[in-house]
Amino acid sequence: MNFNKVFIFVALILAVFAGQSQAGWLKKIGKKIERVGQHTRDATIQVIGVAQQAANVAATARG
């Protein structure tokens, strides 16, 4: 009976420490994904600006 209590206690302690180390790993991946999303957003905004300028040039050239 005591062995079961000790085993459960040790398992809980290991789960707590493993959960904390996992959070750091997941946080790093989350930040990388967020950074990729920000770069994609910025590139899209730049492409839209260039496309609008090209459309303005084409409209001006047509007269």
Swiss-Prot record:
GO BP of this protein:
antibacterial humoral response; defense response to Gram-negative bacterium; defense response to Gram-positive bacterium; innate immune response
Keyword Signal included in the entry's annotation: yes
Output the superkingdom of the source species. Eukaryota
Compartments, as annotated in UniProt: Secreted
Q: Which UniProt keywords apply?
A: Amidation, Antibiotic, Antimicrobial, Immunity, Innate immunity, Secreted, Signal
Chief location:
secreted
Q: Which residues carry this modification: Arginine amide?
A: R62
One GO CC term, this protein = extracellular space
| Signal peptide feature range | 1-23
Q: Does this UniProt record's set of keywords contain Thylakoid?
A: no
Q: What biological function has been recorded for the protein in this entry?
A: Sarcotoxins, which are potent bactericidal proteins, are produced in response to injury. They are cytotoxic to both Gram-positive and Gram-negative bacteria.
Tell me the protein family, please: Belongs to the cecropin family.
Q: What is this protein called?
A: Sarcotoxin-1B
Q: Which organism is it from?
A: Sarcophaga peregrina (Flesh fly)
